[in-house]
Amino acid sequence: MFIYDTKLKQKVPFEPLVQNKANIYVCGPTVYDDAHLGHARSAIAFDLLRRTLELSGYEVMLVRNFTDIDDKIINKAFKENKSIQELSSIYIESYTRDLNALNMKKPSLEPKASEYLDAMVHMIETLLEKNIAYRVSNGDIYLDTSKDKDYGSLSVHNSSIEFGRIGLVQEKRLEQDFVLWKSYKGDNDVGFDSPLGKGRPGWHIECSSMIFKTLALTNTPYQIDIHAGGADLLFPHHENEACQTRCAFGVELAKYWMHNGFVNINNEKMSKSLGNSFFIKDALKNYDGEILRNYLLGVHYRSVLNFNEEDLLVSKKRLDKIYRLKQRVLGTLGGINPNFKKEILECMQDDLNVSKALSVLESMLSSTNEKLDQNPKNKALKGEILANLKFIEELLGIGFKDPSAYFQLGVSESEKQEIENKIEERKRAKEQKDFLKADSIREELLNHKIALMDTPQGTIWEKFF
């Protein structure tokens, strides 16, 4: 298994801290709003990593957090006259619902920052005792980054390293010094009683503390195998996590760092500040979650994905092919083709080379369809094909529906009954040799994006986009 390590800026062999085990921490959302496609892409990228590792024989523990203490949450909760717990719980439920629709495997743990305040306080106390952290006059506590000779080694963020000293008004020793603890400021603020005084943790200390409490190993130079997240988190968040961990405990936080690329909307980086965020829940109004998943995983996780509906519909054709083949082989038993399994897994073991894996899949779909055309009653072949498709389901998380359900997505039960009534009406017209009426019914359904196919077993229908 090879993965791209952001810190080394190259692909490296994955060699876990404990043989045949992999522990992964993925930075989750700050829960003050609904999740957007950037959140979806990050979750899918590292869901693919987990699935690939598991199918390669690793026992995987994946932790993805919820940041439920943050300035954005506090500000929005105040505006909406809610507690931060009430507000964050709304968006935790929304995020979970959205990711379930995308067929995401549930993380091993989903810690909330608010559940690990003691660990955060302990880490800050350690930094104060070592004279690496310092207080300013308003009670806030900062980390002195000059005490970490390796600061900037992860992100190589030159501008941060070259910052000079600034005036005493802000009281920070260096511009890149970051807050560990924010003291309680009174009305419209949130604070927790602690040995540090009333206040709340900074963003960066939250993730490091949750890692130590949920995943960290003992007696190792690294605490976890893989720390992952979006490219936007590389600096300052991940840089500062790594820094405070070295300073507090003298170890590196992670052996490997992995980051997924941005999602652009119309060639412009998606962000709430630009007002072009595309929420998952809005995308799900137009497209089934599996169709979105299939589209989002189709571009290599480190590349920028420029979201547009034209490409989404093109990618849907791949799903259509999977389900059409599945439709032909349902109800058969057999073993997977070992060469197919080996070839496609090797693609994913090469830093999740999903494009190459999908090319192998496309080749299998075409060749097996041709073989079925030549020998449609070959049960052994059908069983092998179904086993191949089952492996794709496990590896990529697509192709798991019943084909008839897939081809009838977006049609309500009442609409289905109307279609069945039309099919029955068309059948009677054909029996009475009223072919003009039969054709008229077919045309009427086509106008509503319903295609009819006459088979030896009767007429079946599909909805098309």
Q: Which residue stretches match the model-derived regions?
A:
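Alpha-helical recognition segments enriched in aromatics with Gly/Pro capping
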Residues: M1-Y32, D47, D118-T332
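N-terminal, positively charged nucleic-acid-binding surface of large information/translation enzymes
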Residues: L8-P13, L17-N103, D454-W461
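Short phosphate-binding/catalytic loops that engage adenosine nucleotides
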Residues: Y58, I132, I450
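Short, glycine/charge-rich beta-strand/loop segments that flank catalytic centers
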Residues: F66-D70, I92-Y95, K105-M120, N138-K147
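The substrate-binding groove and active-site-proximal loops of carbohydrate-active enzymes
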Residues: F78-I84, S108-S114, G230
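Active-site pocket-lining segments that scaffold enzyme catalytic pockets across diverse folds
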Residues: Y95, N100-K106, I124, L128-A133
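Structural preference for alpha-helix termini/caps and helix-kink/transition segments
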Residues: K269-K272, N276-F465
